[in-house]
């Protein structure tokens, strides 16, 4: 009988990170700095409102300053950009996110690129991704992509070493697929990465070679049990929403077929796996930004 897969509990790992962050926030406050995290919400999408309120609740719990900025759904490009400029200049704000998706009439790329890279809480600003491309082994002094960092932290905090492992990533989105390889191939992590997607023809063959599979395509159950090497670690970041025809309620499906858990050695639940880690690492980026700013000011280089 196969041994049950070990659960990669994102809630427990995120709680540990938040406990560590609370200590770091207390040290900053003792030096007169309260890390400030801000969100920009345009419109009143219920899912976005819920996500934003959750971020603020958790940041306040660890002692951070919470700054919530909202604009109506018909806000102009100029109005949104003016708010971005305001947060860039606000010394009380150390990092912020623009909640996506934005209303369709707005130029999302132009807005995101206007964010001060030092205050990029998501870690997805082109400047910060460029720095990551150029930096294989040196110290990182810019925000890191939250979800990819969350995947790695979740494994490492469960005693799983990625060094020498073959990681197959399914999905080519910027949030995870295209960025996680930049972190996994750093010398400090030392994994080998194969990037696949919904258009990959020999996907099953590649998946069967993987020590670790990261499902991030947003394609329901694209990773089947037959695709998984026995003992592999499975991290499910994919989200597909479907309406249950019987109840009429929305149901979330991941990229990894639940039957794969019987073959895997490690598996992250979805939800409850990488999701909580993303929020914890978002707050980490902001606390680190506050620490860097204070260090620069103390050294007279700010």
UniProtKB/Swiss-Prot annotation:
One GO CC term on file: cytosol
Associated pathway: One-carbon metabolism; tetrahydrofolate interconversion
Keywords, in A-Z order: Amino-acid biosynthesis, Histidine biosynthesis, Hydrolase, Methionine biosynthesis, Multifunctional enzyme, NADP, One-carbon metabolism, Oxidoreductase, Purine biosynthesis
EC number: 1.5.1.5, 3.5.4.9
GO annotation, biological process: L-histidine biosynthetic process; methionine biosynthetic process; purine nucleotide biosynthetic process; tetrahydrofolate interconversion
Gene3D superfamilies: Leucine Dehydrogenase, chain A, domain 1, NAD(P)-binding Rossmann-like Domain
Descriptive protein name: Bifunctional protein FolD
Species this chain originates from: Arthrobacter sp. (strain FB24)
Source lineage: Bacteria, Bacillati, Actinomycetota, Actinomycetes, Micrococcales
């Amino acid at each position: 009988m196969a041994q049950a897969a070990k659960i990669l509990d994102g809630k427990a790992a995120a709680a540990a990170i938040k406990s560590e962050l609370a200590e770091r926030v207390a040290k900053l406050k003792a030096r007169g700095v309260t890390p400030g995290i801000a969100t920009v919400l345009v419109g009143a999408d219920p899912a976005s409102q819920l996500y934003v309120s959750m971020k603020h609740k958790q940041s306040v719990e660890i002692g951070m300053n919470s700054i919530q900025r909202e604009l109506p759904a018909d806000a102009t490009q100029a109005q949104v950009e003016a708010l971005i400029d305001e947060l860039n200049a606000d010394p009380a704000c150390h990092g912020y996110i623009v909640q996506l998706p934005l209303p369709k009439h707005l130029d999302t790329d132009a807005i995101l690129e206007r964010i001060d890279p030092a205050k990029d809480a998501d870690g997805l600003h082109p400047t910060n991704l460029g720095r990551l491309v150029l930096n294989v082994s040196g110290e990182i002094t810019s925000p890191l992509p939250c979800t990819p960092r969350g995947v790695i932290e979740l494994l490492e905090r469960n005693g799983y070493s990625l060094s020498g492992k073959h990681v197959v990533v399914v999905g080519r989105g910027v949030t995870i697929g295209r960025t996680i390889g930049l972190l996994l191939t750093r010398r400090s992590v030392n994994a080998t990465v194969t990037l696949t997607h919904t258009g990959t023809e020999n996907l099953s063959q590649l998946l069967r070679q993987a020590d670790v599979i990261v499902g991030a395509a947003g394609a329901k159950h694209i990773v089947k049990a037959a695709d998984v090497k026995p003992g592999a670690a499975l991290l499910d970041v994919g989200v597909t929403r479907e309406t249950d025809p019987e109840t009429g309620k929305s149901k979330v499906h991941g990229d990894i077929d639940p039957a794969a858990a019987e073959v895997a050695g490690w598996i992250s639940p979805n939800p409850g796996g990488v999701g909580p880690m993303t929020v914890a690492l978002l707050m980490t980026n902001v606390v680190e930004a506050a620490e860097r700013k204070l260090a620069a000011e103390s050294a007279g280089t700010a």
